UniProtKB/Swiss-Prot annotation:
Glycosylation sites: N35, N97
Predominant localisation class: secreted
Single GO term (MF): structural constituent of cell wall
Name of the protein: Class I hydrophobin fvh1
Length: 113
């Protein structure tokens, strides 16, 4: 659980980095239009403004234009090797920005696999 002090530090850092270049987080029109490389299996999906997501985004120096966009936390790519469900036992999503490794994926929409 994120402590109040860690959240306060992250919020301060987030405010300090507000001058950084905004990230484009456009969402796909429909889940069936999701590029295979954008399909992720995330242990948690929440709004970017939520405590844990805001903390991670702040520490990474990421400034979003829309703080209500969905982000995935602790994600891994969905592969067909995992079986009929694509190997996802958590939340399957299509995310526009997966450039932060498994830590966080930005601009996510739920998909059915």
């Amino acid at each position: 659980m994120v402590s109040f002090r860690a959240f306060t530090v992250a919020a301060s850092l987030f405010a300090t980095l507000a001058a950084a270049t905004p990230l484009d987080t456009a969402l796909p029109r429909a889940a069936d239009q999701c590029n295979v490389s954008n399909q992720q299996c995330c242990n948690s999906v929440q709004q970017a403004s939520s405590g844990p997501a805001a903390l991670i985004l702040g520490l990474l120096g990421v400034v979003l234009q829309d703080v209500n966009v969905l982000v995935g936390l602790d994600c891994s790519p969905i592969t067909v090797i995992g079986g009929g469900n694509g190997g996802c036992n958590a939340s399957p999503v299509c995310c526009e920005n997966n450039s932060f490794g498994s830590l966080i994926s930005i601009g996510c929409v739920p998909i059915s696999i």
